[in-house]
Every structure is written in structure tokens, then in C-alpha cells.
């Protein structure tokens, strides 16, 4: 995918957003020589950005557990663990965008499960209804959600909480569980990976095969 897709048309409207290097060893922006070094350097870049702008001015770090726009990039081992520690140290919320990775795409229910990290907030859409009806939402830990019990605020749209969307989501979740589709995505993803690796051996122009479950690049 193109990293600028969906972003450049709206700049500079989303102001006060700071971007950090992608934890992508194959094309590491920081010249890392190993996956472990890439994880360390890109996580360090997150901490450096927080310190440069001041922890009090940084509300959240937002990322996909496995990057979809870059073509199924799975961060090197240790990256998300380190980012979680950094966010906790400076009081920064960790937000996972699970619109693509949620509800079985990676062979786990959520990308958070795949990388073994609990975010403070998780956004989701698409997969909750398998695309049959437009539904999206957010899930938050008690640390975040309990604040709104004390100081609620109105944040909704005309068609928020449409009953047809709720019905579609519940029916879809039932099918995902009944037909074991999450584990099926894991098994089919393993098969796809093997085929892609075979193709890589046959075609020198293919430099990298990556991804998880049925999100591959």
C-alpha cells in the first residue's frame, strides 16, 4: 500500500499529529541491521518524539498492530512491548486501529491478541459485520471508560447505534464463532505464506514476504 494514501488530501487539517518511523525491517527507515535493532530504534523514536514535544502535550500513540497500508508489516518482536512500556512511563494512551486487523483477519480475534499487547483504546469496523452493514465502534479499558461515568459527554451521529447494525454485528459474530472462521484464517494464512515463499524463490524480483493470517504482503 501507499503510506500517503488517504492522508495527503486532508493535510494540513489534522494538525498536531506527529509521525514516527515504521517498524519495518525490510525497509527500515533508520538503517537497522537486524529485526531486533529495528524494533529498538523505532521504539526509541517514539520515546524521542514524546520527549521532544513534551509528555504533557502528547495524548495518545495510535497505530495498527500489523500495518495494513505498508502491506502486512508485522513489527519485529519486542516493538509493541517497548512502546507499551514507553506509553505507560509518560502517561500516554496507546490506541490500536483494528479496523483492518480486528475480528479474525490475522488468525486471532484482534491484532492486540496477535502481538500480545492490551491497548487503552481499540477502534474497530468492517470485520464486525464482514462488511455487510456499516458498523464501527471503540472499546476502552476501565482506566479510560470510567472517566466518562464521572464526566459524560455527548458524541454521536444521526444514525448512531442503528438497530439494524447491531443485529448484523451479532449475527456475524455468531457465524464467526460457529464456523470457526478465526482459526480458519490462521490455517489458510499459513498455507498462503508457504505459497508466497515458493513464489519468492521462483521470482528474484520479490524481495520480501510478510504478514499474518490472511493479511499478507
Model features per residue range: what roles?
Residues 1-217:
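Conserved N-terminal phosphate-binding loop of PLP-dependent enzymes in the Aspartate aminotransferase
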